[in-house]
Amino acid sequence: MKSDKPFLERYFYTPTLLQKGLIFALYPFSLIYQCIATFKRKTAKKHDFKIPIISVGNLIAGGSGKTPFILEIAPRYQEVAIISRGYQRNSKGLVVVSVKGKILVSQNTAGDEAYLLALNLKQASVIVSEKRELGILKALELGSKIVFLDDGFRFNFNQFNLLLKPKVPPYYPFCLPSGLYRESIKSYKEAHLVITEDKDYKRITSTTHPTKRMLLVTAIANPSRLNAFLPKEVVKKIYFKDHAPFNLKLLEKEFHKNNATSLLVTSKDLVKLQDCKLPLSVLDLRLEIDPKVLEKIDNYIFSYPYNTKEHL
């Protein structure tokens, strides 16, 4: 736990001269990583499930707004399934998190992102599975007519590939470990649709239950991206690793040490604080998406003969 910008975020976005030397020393490994990732995707067995599958992904490791994007577009349709890996869950294999809004498992079993989706998407079913093809088959079994696949670009499915592109890219366009990309930056050209922040969508934030002295506590990737949206009443920022669980005793200690009047958390972090007795303020994030983007997604979905606006 630390309250300054995490090392990896500095390394990938604002590297020092010494870090730049390390980046170029590791570059041969990045080329190997890039070749393996691209080879695996292009040679993977092709699957066609005869159902519209919208993959919401990114080329950059870590958060880029995939969950808020799905939260924004999924409610526009009925008979929807959301399929995710279920990061940092304490379960393995395929787990049905919710069926049409009825939540079946705990946050720990589902993972924070999947549980957040289940809480907010009352018309959708949420499934987590390391093997996405099994998740899609389960969605079909549940009667879903549309699938939103979280982070599915690397899978060779017959799907609509949508890639989110951040407003601020990493310092170098390299793959891991020299950069933050999981595939070559040229892979953007292979997507059906590339959605760029502040061009095709904008982040809109509001604070629920604000107080005079808020202590920001978050466990998301690249947490400094929240800075532009934080209220002036934030007295300190405490960052945990992405998806990390919160230690409630540590939070209580920091709360009193900083004379805070509430913890400020994101909606994603809130699902992990159900047992927290401290006052909570919530930084709500939603996306305003260009209607042209929504129209392109609609056109793909309605290209399937049994999907019509009357039915969905």
Curated annotation (Swiss-Prot):
Signal peptide: none annotated. Belongs to the LpxK family. Its EC number is 2.7.1.130. This is Tetraacyldisaccharide 4'-kinase. GO terms for cellular component: plasma membrane. Transfers the gamma-phosphate of ATP to the 4'-position of a tetraacyldisaccharide 1-phosphate intermediate (termed DS-1-P) to form tetraacyldisaccharide 1,4'-bis-phosphate (lipid IVA). It comes from Helicobacter acinonychis (strain Sheeba). ATP binds at residues 60-67. It catalyses: a lipid A disaccharide + ATP = a lipid IVA + ADP + H(+).
